[in-house]
């Protein structure tokens, strides 16, 4: 969701609460739980899951390996669920022409630097830069070049924008900020 007026442009950034992250976390949780149950079934010699008879899977080495994969999968799944619940990467970009200030806010991982807040003057913005890498995995990222601070990404690297969409977004932002566009 974006909000735009003559003097203020606010762009909300979705973080890790995407449908694909929910799907991957859920699939990984169920799969790793299945692996762990099969490994435990082979150790106990009982059927904890009725789909796989435990007599067919020997505990050493198959049961140990399946238990290890199950535990590793549960750790990765819990990491994904934590990033989803903390909504890591979400935030907003606020461009205020009236005040002449740009604010970029993102949520990070819990700790001392959970809130990432960048604030600088519009006069320090040198340009809006589009970085394009074509190939098997094309990547198009929009950056804001700041004097003395380098380039700050405005779009996520996994956001697959078409060339037309990234050009339009860059043109609108450059027009709003009254800065040039660079393409790399």
Swiss-Prot record:
Short name of any one Pfam family annotated for the protein: Ycf4
Coiled coil: none
GO CC term, one of those recorded: chloroplast thylakoid membrane
InterPro entries xrefs: PSI_Ycf4_assembly (IPR003359)
Keyword NADP: no
Keyword Membrane found: yes
Stated family: Belongs to the Ycf4 family.
Cell compartment(s), UniProt: Plastid, Chloroplast thylakoid membrane
Name used for this protein in its record: Photosystem I assembly protein Ycf4
Stored PANTHER family: PHOTOSYSTEM I ASSEMBLY PROTEIN YCF4 (PTHR33288:SF4), PTHR33288
Its membrane topology: Multi-pass membrane protein
NCBIfam families per the UniProt record, alphabetical: PRK02542.1
Domain of life according to the entry: Eukaryota
GO BP terms: photosynthesis
Keyword annotations from UniProtKB, A to Z: Chloroplast, Membrane, Photosynthesis, Plastid, Thylakoid, Transmembrane, Transmembrane helix
Annotated function: Seems to be required for the assembly of the photosystem I complex.
């Amino acid at each position: 969701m974006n909000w735009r007026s003559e003097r203020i442009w606010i762009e909300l950034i979705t973080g890790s609460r995407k449908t694909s992250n929910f799907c991957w976390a859920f699939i990984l949780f169920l799969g790793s739980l299945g692996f762990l149950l099969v490994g435990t079934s082979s150790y106990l010699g009982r059927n904890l899951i009725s789909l796989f008879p435990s007599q067919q899977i020997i505990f050493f080495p198959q049961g140990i390996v399946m238990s290890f994969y199950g535990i590793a999968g549960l750790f990765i799944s819990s990491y994904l669920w934590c990033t989803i619940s903390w909504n890591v990467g979400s935030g907003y970009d606020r461009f205020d022409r009236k005040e002449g200030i740009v604010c970029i806010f993102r949520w990070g991982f819990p700790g001392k630097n959970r809130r990432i807040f960048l604030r600088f003057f519009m006069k320090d913005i040198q340009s809006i830069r589009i970085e394009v890498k074509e190939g098997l995995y094309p990547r198009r990222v929009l950056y804001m070049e700041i004097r003395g601070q380098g380039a700050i990404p405005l779009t996520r690297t996994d956001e697959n924008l078409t060339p037309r969409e990234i050009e339009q977004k860059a043109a609108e932002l450059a027009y709003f900020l009254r800065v040039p566009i660079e393409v790399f």
